[in-house]
Each structure stands twice: as structure tokens, then as C-alpha cells.
């Protein structure tokens, strides 16, 4: 039993944009409170995946419990709940904010407020958190703390008169932050007497103990001898252990309202213990779950195929394993004439897709081909029905459908105003509809556009970063479906449709894309003994075509002089053979060709 009174508990999280120093600040807090000994310390202590350290982003949530003796000589328990900062993981952020009473808003004093920070601050304000502004990296030569404070006041409307200047790297201002957490973050409500409810804010898969669930007790208490019920999945379990994260797991007998801990109960898959679900007691359950639970729906889809067909079973096993720890990942088997067997996978967004692909290649040693990302289209059929389709090659022919609708997102881009023109150009190229433009400060601007999601999921982010030298940041949310003049663009190689290259494009762009596709394929497909036509088509109409000329063997080389009819006979025989070859021959499209074309597709 942890015998700490509720009034001495502070639950807080850190909100920051990528690279604004959140993980370093968390390290400092762990060090200064003596939670982690100096000798055990490694950088980005809470980012446990190699991939997280390498990319410098937080993907999975972590939590740590720190003991801190404040200036009023009382001992407090501070629970830090780490949040991912990326737009793909915003649902995880909203759940972890629900487990807190306060938040440190960390802003890089040399860069200012960014889009993701804003999105998360609004989430925090919706959850009524006490927000403490912290200006990090004040030791950098380019830091301008006063200007950034003014920016925070203008953009977010937070009072920054008691903002804290700190440098997580050198340790300046860390003590002030700890004191501010104790003084300004309210303690949890004392609801120990009420029925037990606990919020799951994260879970991960441990191969030996099953799923480990991180939770915050909202009301009542949890004892390790009790049976628990998960209210969304309706499953019940016997507890094997409960404990606290200091940052390594330590078992305890009981946790009460306000505390943050972990539990293990031989849960088989993360999908059974979803983020946002409510834990209650089986024998005396709560009447209604905590609000806000929803299942994460994938927004971006792509095909994953092993480069070596023998690796297909390994890919299946590794996706199963990955799904145990990533409940947002969806997949189903798919086959393609060009690529063989693989899986169609659904992801929360582009970053999520890259991370899954990288984890498959790194942790499971697979070599993968990824088809161009696509979104879910709504196809209205002729007889008043509609279907949703995530794979462009399965969209019905033009005569069977009335129209295609695609998802739109509302996007806000924050950038210095000298990049206004280039960003507007980029949004227009991507079929964006201009909605509004606001000047946040004299030199920073917000652009608001409505853009088809399909245009965002390819390489919008990379383009935006490269055109603005990395200064712009964006965030978006789904708005719904809209009708557009969309067509299915097929690529035919030797009159056979190559499924992985099928895409849904806007009619106005179809010709340009079709043209560049066939030209690129012409360069990449090796010559065969017969002529290969490459065509781009919309329905039965060919809009662009190229052909690869045949390799020709010199059949007359062994006739020295001699009769013309002999030569004619040989040439006729060769022509006949070529004709048969063309009818029978299969064109092997090399994997590199697909990869290059997929890049071009973007």
C-alpha cells in the first residue's frame, strides 16, 4: 500500500513540439528528484524504443513517479506522464491529458510556438488542466525569451508573467519548475470512497507477462487481490501484480484515487486493453465508464509486400506481434499479380506508417516494398448505394458508379510570413481551398486550408518542410467527405493491369501523372525479346502510352551469301516466334521499377 495522502500527489504531463527539449527536461526532473541515480542515467530515459531515441520523438507513452521534498519541507509525489507530440498520436495525447491535473507547456526560446504544441494546448485546456509555461533552451545564443512570452500570450492567451526560464541541458531553472508543479498544479480530487474507476492511458506488450497496462486511478482504489473488469471490451481478469513506475516497476499491494501505476493480468493483446478504457472491479463495478473513449480508426492505407516471397509467413507473424503492442494497426492479406502475397495495412497517419515499416524492418529483419499510401474513398454506386474502399485497384468501373467522394481535412499551417507565397503555392498544387489567413505576430502567420487527405498523405509534410527551410509546422483534423471529379488511373504493361500502380487521381491531373508514369516505366523495365507496350488508362480510354522496343537477335549471321529465300525463311520463322512470345511472354517488372514509380507517384 502506498500511504501517501491525495493532497500530496501531483499528476502532470509535458506538452512540447518535436525537438523543443521535452525528453531532456524529463531526464533532468528524474535526476534532480533523485529518482534515477546519476550512474544509471542515459539520455532520453523515458523514450525506451531505439527508434524513439534516434528520431528524437516520443511514440509510446511512458510514466514515472518522483518523490520531491519541496521548500515547505513536505514530501510530495509527482507523477510525470509523458505524451507523444506528433499529430498522428493525438488520441493518445488526449487520454494522457485526462490522467493529469496540470501540464508544463515547453516552448523552445529560440523557435517559438509550433502547430503541434498548439493542438495539444487546446486539448489540455479542454481537460481543464493548469498550464505552466516553460521557456526551454534559454542558454542558446538565439534565444529571445521575452519575444516568445509575448507570442504565447498572443497566440494561446496564457498569462506568462510567471513563466519559467530554464535550460534542461545545463540544469538552470529545474528547481523552479518542481516548485511550480507543487504550488500551481491542483491535487487530484479525493474520491477514495466512490466506486473504483481507473483510466488506461497506455499499454504495451511484454512477451513474458502479457499486456502491461498503465493507468491512473480516478476514484476508489485497486487492490492486487481483486478481479477487474474492462468496461469497453467487457472482459474480466485476475490481477497478477500492480505497482508504480519509479521509473522501473515496483510492486505494491494497493493504489488509491489520484495515483498512477501499472498492472499485469495476463491480458493477451493490447487490443483487449485499449487506451481510454475504464478499469473497474468485477464484484462491485461502477455504473458508467469514464467519458471520451473511442477506438482509433486508421486514416492511411498501403500495401506491404516482402521483397522475397519466402518471407511472407515471417511478415504475417511479425505483424501479429506488432499488433499486440500497437492497437491502432489494422491489416488484412492481399495478393497482387506483380508483387505476390502481402498485406493491406491501415495506419493513423504517415508517421505511424513509417514507424511501423521501420520497426518491421529493424526488429523483425524483413525487407519490404511499400505501395503508395491511399485513403478511404466513398464510392456512390448507380443504385443509391455506397461503399467505402481503401484500395484503389478495387474501385468499380466507371459505368457501375455514379461518383467518388474523398475525405477532406482542415489544415492549419504556422510559418514565418516570408514563406507565405511558397506555402500558398504548395496548397494550391495540392487542390487546397483557401479559407483564412491570420497574422499571429508581426512576422508569423497562420494559413487555414481545406485539403483532400489524399494530397496530404503522400509527401506534403516533406515538401512543406523543404520549401520553408524547416520552419513551418502543421496540424490537421478530418472534416468529412466531398464529391470530386476523381478517376481511377490504371497502368497496363503488355496489356496486363499492374495493380500496385493503380491510383485515384483528379481528372485534371490524370494526364500529367499518366504521362510521367509510363515514361518512368519505359526507362526502368529491361528490354525483352518482344515489343512491350506500356499504357496509362482511365476505364477503357488510353491517355498515355510508350513502348519498349524488342531486343533483336541477328538470325542471318550464319548465312554467308547464298539464296535470298533461305534468309526470308529464317526471318519469317523469327517473326513467328516473336509473335508467339508476345502472346505467351510475361513481363517481369523489376522491384526497383515499382519503387521508383511509387516515389514518382508522390
Curated annotation (Swiss-Prot):
Single Gene Ontology BP annotation: translation
Domain tr-type G: 7-189
Subcellular localization(s) per the UniProt record: Cell inner membrane
Residues that hold GTP according to the record: 19-24, 136-139
Enzyme nomenclature, EC number: 3.6.5.n1
A GO CC term attached to the entry: plasma membrane
Keyword list, A-Z: Cell inner membrane, Cell membrane, GTP-binding, Hydrolase, Membrane, Nucleotide-binding, Protein biosynthesis
UniProt topology in membrane: Peripheral membrane protein
Enzyme class: hydrolase
Catalytic reactions on record: GTP + H2O = GDP + phosphate + H(+)
Alphabetized GO MF terms: GTP binding; GTPase activity; ribosome binding
InterPro entries linked: EF-4, EFG_III/V, EFG_V-like, EFTu-like_2, G_TR_CS, GUFP, LepA_C_sf, LepA_CTD
UniProt keyword annotation of Cell membrane present: yes
Family to which the UniProt record says this protein belongs: Belongs to the TRAFAC class translation factor GTPase superfamily. Classic translation factor GTPase family. LepA subfamily.
PANTHER family tied to this protein: TRANSLATION FACTOR GUF1 HOMOLOG, CHLOROPLASTIC, TRANSLATION FACTOR GUF1-RELATED
Function according to Swiss-Prot or TrEMBL: Required for accurate and efficient protein synthesis under certain stress conditions. May act as a fidelity factor of the translation reaction, by catalyzing a one-codon backward translocation of tRNAs on improperly translocated ribosomes. Back-translocation proceeds from a post-translocation (POST) complex to a pre-translocation (PRE) complex, thus giving elongation factor G a second chance to translocate the tRNAs correctly. Binds to ribosomes in a GTP-dependent manner.
Classification via NCBIfam families: lepA, small_GTP
Name recorded for this polypeptide: Elongation factor 4
Record organism: Prochlorococcus marinus (strain MIT 9301)
Gene: lepA
Amino acid at each position: 500500500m502506498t500511504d501517501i495522502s491525495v493532497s500530496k500527489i501531483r499528476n502532470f504531463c509535458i506538452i512540447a513540439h518535436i525537438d523543443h527539449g521535452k525528453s531532456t527536461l524529463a531526464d533532468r526532473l528524474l535526476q534532480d528528484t533523485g529518482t534515477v541515480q546519476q550512474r544509471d542515467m542515459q539520455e532520453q530515459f523515458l523514450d525506451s524504443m531505439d527508434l524513439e531515441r534516434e528520431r528524437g520523438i516520443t511514440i509510446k507513452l511512458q510514466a514515472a513517479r518522483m518523490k520531491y521534498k519541496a521548500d515547505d519541507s513536505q514530501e510530495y509525489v509527482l507523477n510525470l506522464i509523458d505524451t507523444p507530440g506528433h499529430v498522428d498520436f493525438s488520441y493518445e495525447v488526449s487520454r494522457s491529458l485526462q490522467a493529469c491535473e496540470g501540464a508544463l507547456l515547453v516552448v523552445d526560446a529560440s523557435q517559438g510556438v509550433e502547430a503541434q504544441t498548439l493542438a495539444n494546448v487546446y486539448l489540455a485546456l479542454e481537460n481543464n488542466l493548469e498550464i505552466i509555461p516553460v521557456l526551454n533552451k534559454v542558454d542558446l545564443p538565439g534565444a529571445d525569451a521575452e519575444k516568445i512570452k509575448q507570442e504565447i500570450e498572443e497566440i494561446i492567451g496564457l498569462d506568462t508573467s510567471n513563466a519559467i526560464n530554464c535550460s534542461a541541458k545545463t540544469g538552470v531553472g529545474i528547481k523552479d519548475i518542481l516548485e511550480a508543479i507543487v504550488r500551481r498544479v491542483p491535487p487530484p480530487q479525493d474520491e477514495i470512497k466512490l466506486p473504483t474507476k481507473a483510466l488506461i492511458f497506455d499499454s504495451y506488450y511484454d512477451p513474458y507477462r502479457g499486456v502491461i497496462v498503465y493507468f491512473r486511478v480516478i476514484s476508489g482504489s485497486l487492490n492486487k487481490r481483486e478481479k477487474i473488469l474492462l468496461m469497453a471490451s467487457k472482459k474480466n481478469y485476475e490481477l497478477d501484480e500492480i505497482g508504480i513506475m519509479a521509473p522501473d516497476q515496483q510492486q505494491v499491494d494497493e493504489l488509491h484515487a489520484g495515483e498512477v501505476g501499472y498492472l499485469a493480468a495476463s491480458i493477451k493483446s493490447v487490443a483487449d486493453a485499449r487506451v481510454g478504457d475504464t478499469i473497474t472491479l468485477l464484484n462491485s463495478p461502477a455504473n458508467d465508464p469514464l467519458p471520451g473513449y473511442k477506438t482509433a480508426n486508421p486514416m492511411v492505407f498501403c500495401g506491404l509486400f516482402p521483397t522475397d516471397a519466402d518471407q511472407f509467413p515471417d511478415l504475417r507473424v511479425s505483424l501479429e506481434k506488432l499488433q499486440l503492442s500497437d492497437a491502432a494497426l489494422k491489416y488484412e492479406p492481399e495478393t497482387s499479380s506483380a508483387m505476390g502475397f502481402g498485406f493491406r495495412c491501415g495506419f493513423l497517419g504517415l508517421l505511424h506508417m513509417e514507424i511501423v515499416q521501420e520497426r518491421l524492418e529493424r526488429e523483425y529483419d524483413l525487407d519490404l516494398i511499400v505501395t503508395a499510401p491511399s485513403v478511404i474513398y466513398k464510392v456512390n454506386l448507380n443504385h443509391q448505394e455506397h461503399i467505402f474502399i481503401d484500395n484503389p485497384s478495387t474501385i468499380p468501373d466507371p459505368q457501375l458508379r455514379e461518383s467518388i467522394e474523398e475525405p477532406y481535412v482542415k489544415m492549419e499551417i504556422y510559418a514565418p510570413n516570408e514563406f507565405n507565397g511558397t506555402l500558398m503555392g504548395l496548397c494550391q498544387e495540392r487542390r487546397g481551398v483557401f479559407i483564412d489567413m491570420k497574422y499571429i505576430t508581426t512576422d508569423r502567420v497562420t494559413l487555414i486550408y481545406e485539403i483532400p487527405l489524399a494530397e496530404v498523405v503522400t509527401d506534403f509534410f516533406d515538401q512543406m518542410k523543404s520549401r520553408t527551410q524547416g520552419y513551418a509546422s502543421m496540424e490537421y483534423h478530418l472534416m468529412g467527405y466531398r464529391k470530386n471529379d476523381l478517376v481511377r488511373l490504371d497502368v497496363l504493361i503488355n496489356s496486363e493491369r499492374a495493380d500496385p500502380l493503380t491510383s485515384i487521381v483528379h481528372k485534371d491531373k490524370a494526364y500529367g501523372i499518366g504521362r510521367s508514369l509510363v515514361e518512368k516505366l519505359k526507362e526502368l523495365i529491361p528490354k525483352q525479346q518482344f515489343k512491350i507496350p506500356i499504357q496509362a488508362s482511365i476505364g477503357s480510354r488510353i491517355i498515355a502510352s510508350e513502348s519498349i522496343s524488342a531486343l533483336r537477335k541477328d538470325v542471318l549471321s550464319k548465312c554467308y551469301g547464298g539464296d535470298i529465300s533461305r534468309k526470308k525463311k529464317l526471318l519469317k520463322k523469327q517473326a513467328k516466334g516473336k509473335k508467339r512470345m508476345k502472346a505467351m511472354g510475361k513481363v517481369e517488372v523489376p522491384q526497383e521499377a515499382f519503387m521508383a514509380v511509387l516515389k514518382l507517384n508522390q
